[in-house]
Amino acid sequence: MANVVVIGAQWGDEGKGKITDLLSRSADVVVRYQGGVNAGHTIVVDDKVLKLHLIPSGILYEDTTCLIGSGTVVDPKILLKEIDMLIENGIDISGLKISSTSHVTMPYHRLLDEAMEADRGSNKIGTTGRGIGPTYADKSQRNGIRIRDLLNEDRLKDVLEIPLKEKNGVLEKIYGIRPLCKDEIIKEYLDYGKRLSKHVVDCTRTIHSAAKNKQNILFEGAQGTLLDLDHGTYPFVTSSNPISGGACIGAGVGPTLIDRVIGVAKAYTTRVGEGPFVTELQGSINDQLCDRGSEFGTTTGRRRRCGWFDGVIGKYAVYVNGLDCLAVTKLDVLDELDEIQVCIAYELDGKEIDYFPTNSDDLKKCKPIFKKLKGWQCSTANCRKLSDLPENAMNYLRFLAELMEVPIAIVSLGANRDQTIVIEDPIHGPKRALLR
């Protein structure tokens, strides 16, 4: 039995959904511990493409409990769309549970998010415009609406009074946006509450009960390490903590409950939105990675920025999260390249550094120092064990493991479930050297 955290080791979009889906087969409980509908993961099942933003990937397994934890912010309108989509595809959603203390994204949060981002002009952050930041801001200011508030009309009227008055004032006086109607919001969100009520639980008690019964618990993060509010490329970050420590806070468990932390990293690097990106590529190779990797955001549809694998941020992710092993995804995207580069250090103000600068101004000045490796120029999409991989592909993986000083447990070679090499089951397997 093992309790495992799956986190993104880059700027999000690493393929965590597929890895979580894979590991969910061995999990009894899957917990989403932070983020909101600004995240998105795509799962391919029997040629069906399922795109989820809030519901954990484990929902595809009927005996698995899927819990949206207290650290997650929930847009009930989008959540219900996901529920309806799953039901239409014949997927049982009885295992879905929602923490009663999760905060709710309200209509004014979305309006404020869009208005504030537009107002920033050239200094925009690159927000998805889904209201995540304003929702977390209200949570921090103790002015938020929680899932439990949608279950009682009198309570919803009471807790909505002050924030709606404040937000309407800001929307109207600063941004020239028409005020929202309280009665309409109450009616709409009480309806959401009725539909979701059968899924609402006490998050901490649910996880504690599972742990007491020796069940396997999988903690699923959204976004990635470099988007962490405290440890990412601030201010170009999200409004929560995707790193492994965030799992304890967002799920309501102690750190001693965590047995293993798995980092998910692409075989190259991508980033959506604004912010420094040291290994970013331009021109034909960037286009090739983007096209072969289908690098368009699940949530926004925005084209992702692409670059070579950055070992500096990789080592930073290992340290910040305490990674035990790695899952490397999209290795197949590199199949056609005759030469592949990996960033092994930065140059900052004429000096070589091997650490990640936490100051975004310094990071913008950094230049990558690359190690060139030979490509393999043949398809890896049908490889199912390590011995099937071309020698240069194996050399590439070994180099990444050596550079990051952490073993590789899983290699993904495409979107489908079976396009995966599992070197060791991170939940049931012993903690030992995998691929170094």
Swiss-Prot record:
Organism domain of life: Bacteria
- Provide the binding site for GTP: 12-18, 40-42, 304, 330-332, 412-414
User: Which Pfam families does the protein's record reference?
Assistant: Adenylsucc_synt (PF00709)
Q: Which InterPro entries match?
A: Adenylosuccin_syn_GTP-bd (IPR018220), Adenylosuccin_syn_Lys_AS (IPR033128), Adenylosuccinate_synth_dom1 (IPR042109), Adenylosuccinate_synth_dom2 (IPR042110), Adenylosuccinate_synth_dom3 (IPR042111), Adenylosuccinate_synthetase (IPR001114), P-loop_NTPase (IPR027417)
EC number(s) recorded for this UniProt protein: 6.3.4.4
The reactions it catalyses are: IMP + L-aspartate + GTP = N(6)-(1,2-dicarboxyethyl)-AMP + GDP + phosphate + 2 H(+)
Pathway, per Swiss-Prot/TrEMBL? Answer: Purine metabolism; AMP biosynthesis via de novo pathway; AMP from IMP: step 1/2
Q: Which residues bind IMP?
A: 13-16, 38-41, 128, 142, 223, 238, 302
Example GO CC term: the record gives:
cytoplasm
The name this protein goes by in its record: Adenylosuccinate synthetase
Protein encoded by which gene: purA
